[in-house]
Regions:
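An N-terminal hydrophobic leader/cap segment in hydrolases
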Residues: 2-54
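Conserved alpha/beta-hydrolase
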Residues: 92-112
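Alpha/beta-hydrolase active-site loop
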Residues: 117-134
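Gly/Ala-rich beta-loop-alpha elbow adjacent to hydrolase catalytic centers
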Residues: 141-142, 146
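Short glycine-enriched nucleophile-adjacent loop
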Residues: 147-157
Length: 196
């Protein structure tokens, strides 16, 4: 993903006058996911699922939820950064075919959920809140950041019979280093490695 030049220049400008301001601005930028239009391939899942907005008091935000009802085990699907709950439509369809009650949601600041900003700790709180309100879930599948958030929910007592993570980074630092390098707060990839 290429960062627009005006953002790079604004970070450099702030950094010239105040490193602290530049870092705060970079942290704010990092919290804003890119929103993409839902592609046609996700429409079947969107149309066949039950949609409900649920308020998550722990983060003071509303999230859009999607459910394919069934009488079998409950499975939670958690998408990655800049994605949508409907993005996991193929997994949802297969799980539902096997008789599972499938549940997914748009992370805060994603899809049809409220807000323009979010960070991993907020998403973990959403996963935990859904586990308590709608769960417990028998299974959980997370893609990228979604996998990180499911793994973190385990630390706080959520329990799943099985959990699957797909392309989840094992170290969050790499994502931050890459972003900081792209906005030119670090000027070489070697410098980014030295900061780890």
């Amino acid at each position: 993903l290429k960062i627009p030049l005006y953002i790079v220049l604004s970070v450099k400008f702030l950094n010239f006058f105040s490193e602290n301001l530049a870092v705060k601005y970079a942290a704010f930028l990092f919290s804003i996911p890119i929103k993409f239009r839902r592609p046609d391939r996700e429409n079947e899942y969107f149309l066949n699922s039950i949609h409900k907005k649920i308020y998550i008091p722990e983060v003071d935000k509303k999230i859009m939820t999607y459910e394919l009802e069934a009488s079998g085990p409950k499975v939670l699907l958690v998408h990655g950064w800049s994605g949508r709950g409907t993005q996991m439509h193929a997994l949802a369809k297969e799980c539902h075919k096997e008789g599972m009650n499938v549940f997914s949601f748009d992370l805060p600041a994603h899809g049809q959920s409220s807000s323009n900003t979010t960070l991993i700790p907020e998403v973990v709180k959403c996963v935990r809140s859904l586990y308590q309100k709608i769960g417990p879930f028998d299974y959980a599948i997370g893609h990228s950041i979604g996998g990180i958030c499911i793994m973190n929910s385990l630390r706080f007592g959520d329990k799943y019979k099985k959990m699957v993570t797909i392309s989840s980074p094992h170290v969050n630092v790499d994502m931050f280093k890459d972003f900081i390098f792209k906005i030119c707060l670090l000027y070489t990839s070697d410098a980014a490695d030295d900061q780890a």
